[in-house]
Swiss-Prot record:
Subcellular location: Cell inner membrane; Periplasm; Cell outer membrane
Induction: Is maximally expressed in the late stationary growth phase (at protein and mRNA level). Minimal comP expression levels are detected in the middle of the logarithmic growth phase.
Organism of this sequence: Acinetobacter baylyi (strain ATCC 33305 / BD413 / ADP1)
Residues the record lists as N-methylphenylalanine modifications: 7
Taxonomy of the source species: Bacteria, Pseudomonadati, Pseudomonadota, Gammaproteobacteria, Moraxellales
Function noted in UniProt: Pilin-like competence factor, which is essential for natural transformation of the Gram-negative soil bacterium A.baylyi ADP1. Is not a subunit of the pilus structures. Likely functions as a major subunit of an oligomeric structure acting as a channel or pore mediating DNA translocation through the outer membrane and periplasm.
Protein name per Swiss-Prot or TrEMBL: Pilin-like competence factor ComP
PANTHER family (UniProt xref): GENERAL SECRETION PATHWAY PROTEIN G, PREPILIN PEPTIDASE-DEPENDENT PROTEIN D
Keyword Glycoprotein: yes
Single GO cellular component term: cell outer membrane
Keyword entries, A-Z: Cell inner membrane, Cell membrane, Cell outer membrane, Competence, DNA-binding, Glycoprotein, Membrane, Methylation, Periplasm
Propeptide: 1-6
């Protein structure tokens, strides 16, 4: 008797089906991961802005309204990101446009799903605390912005 060598057609079809199922699960998960990584870049870009705003608030002893060009505001000295100096994933990052010291980061619409992150400072008892909020899909933003 001759011993069978190699794989039968049904065995190959089963292996291909298993690979297809794994790919169907892995590709969407990887896509979500890459978007989250890009949105995290926006939070990283805002960290230097947060440091400058926190120092200004502590020096003034209060939140002071105004933009980076307004003398004495909480945003003085902040390096904003505009369309002219945007990064691959961060479209804009502004300070003080909505309220005193507030930082709004807008992500690229195609690569980072247009996520928006708003960082709002509060000053109490000599300490500055930050609250991160978003109107974007929660699965794309860092955990500290999901609450």
């Amino acid at each position: 008797m001759n011993a069978q060598k190699g794989f039968t057609l049904i065995e190959l079809m089963i292996v291909i089906a298993i690979i297809g199922i794994l790919a169907a699960i892995a590709i969407p998960a990887y896509t979500d991961y890459t978007v989250r990584a890009r949105v995290s870049e926006g939070l990283t870009a805002a960290s230097s802005m947060k440091t400058t705003v926190s120092e200004n608030i502590l020096n003034a002893g209060a939140l002071v309204a105004g933009t980076p060009s307004t003398a004495g505001s909480s945003c003085v000295g902040v390096q904003e990101i505009s369309a002219s100096n945007a990064t691959t994933n961060v479209a804009t990052a502004t300070c003080g446009a909505s309220s005193a010291g507030q930082i709004i980061v807008t992500m690229d619409t195609t690569k980072a799903k247009g996520a928006n992150i708003t960082l709002t400072p509060t000053y109490a008892s000599g300490a500055v605390t930050w609250k991160c909020t978003t109107t974007s899909d929660k699965k794309y933003v860092p955990s500290e912005c999901r609450g």
